[in-house]
Amino acid sequence: MIQKPNLSFWKLWNLSFGFFGVQIAYALQSANISRIFATLGADPHNLSYFWILPPLMGILVQPIVGTLSDKTWCRFGRRIPFLFVGATVAVLVMCLLPNAGSFGMAVSTAMVFGLISLMFLDTSINMAMQPFKMLVGDMVNEKQKSLAYSIQSFLCNSGSLVGYVFPFLFTFLGIANEAPKGVIPDSVIYSFYVGAAILILCVIYTTLKVKEWNPEEYAQYNEADPEANEKSADWITLLKKAPTMFWKVGLVQLFCWAAFMYMWTYTNGTIAETVWHTTDVASSGYQEAGNWVGVLFFWQAIGSVLWAMALPKFKNEKFAYALSLVIGGIGFAIVPFIGDKTLLVLPFLLIGCAWAAMLAMPFAFVTNALEGYSHKGAYLGLFNGTICVPQIMAAMCGGYLLHLVGSHQSNMMIVAGVLLVCGAVAVAAIRNPKRA
């Protein structure tokens, strides 16, 4: 096998640039889904059930995209066609979802419309997101993978900065942040429109700038039979042959993604309770809290961007991973005890450290362990299960846990903190990868 060539910084940048737009869409979804469905009339104890759809679509779509793209060799590339189709569908659905309450439908009908829109949005975002991870695995050598995934993490978090702050920014510019009962405010609707436009522009940029290898070049650099990926291999067989690192990192992922599922689900209700002292979803205070969630997630992304730049400086990647999760766990744990909206920025900066590590480090560990394996795209799609399954489990248990902690959404932040610390403990089973 010939060593993969070192790529210039800008080639590494171009591989992941479209992730910036995809992450804007993902940020708008993660910051506003609880707000949207609560505004439509969902009960807080049932709110987590709406969050089952995003990871469920991920666990179904991403392995399929990985498997199909392993077998795809066309004039437009191997991974790029899936990226472009997913982004196009996402743009269309982003124009529909925030209007779920604007078509004069009954509450139940609006909920169903919102759920169907959310299902298609999740499907398309996952379809657009997975190719970026596979492009790095395909074209970047071991020595540069940490840098490549750190760039991806930087772009991902930069996209989050933009997506999270949109509703707050539009409200500041005079766009209405209140609406009749059951209707989503214009500040949220316009945010989705602008996010959709940026998404398609970013994906077009990556499509034009990235030239994937042909089958012969891929085989030359990846020590894999170009026909091997075309042979059928069921997922059970692949999982049985998966490297040990796949499962060890997966255990860490279990705790981490469950923690962040509770953050996305309950942050709006938490700060509405602790800062604005309201649980009325039709009140101006609740909608202000919804905007401030975006601001806090903005600062979380700032923390992630800064920490992502620091992560490559650590010589011991295992230590960096565990440290990041502990810092994030502390951030979660102190959220319920802060009643000032400005001071809440601090714990979300800390939470951003964990997020940066979660985006960059698991895939660096796993893609290094997959060197020489056929069906690499399928493996990365299956590894996405370590992101999706924990979220599904957390969403299914969310209402029950909320009852256990006194029906105060703020207490779910403490639960999230404990989960991250458990994830840090699980890092002990991981070995640091060998660098070329």
What are these regions (language model features)?
Residues 2-57, 248, 252, 256-280:
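Helix-loop boundary and gating motifs at the non-cytosolic
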Residues 43-53, 186, 277-301, 411:
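Loop-to-transmembrane helix entry
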Residues 44-45, 142-154, 373-383:
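Loop-to-transmembrane helix entry/capping segments in MFS-fold secondary transporters
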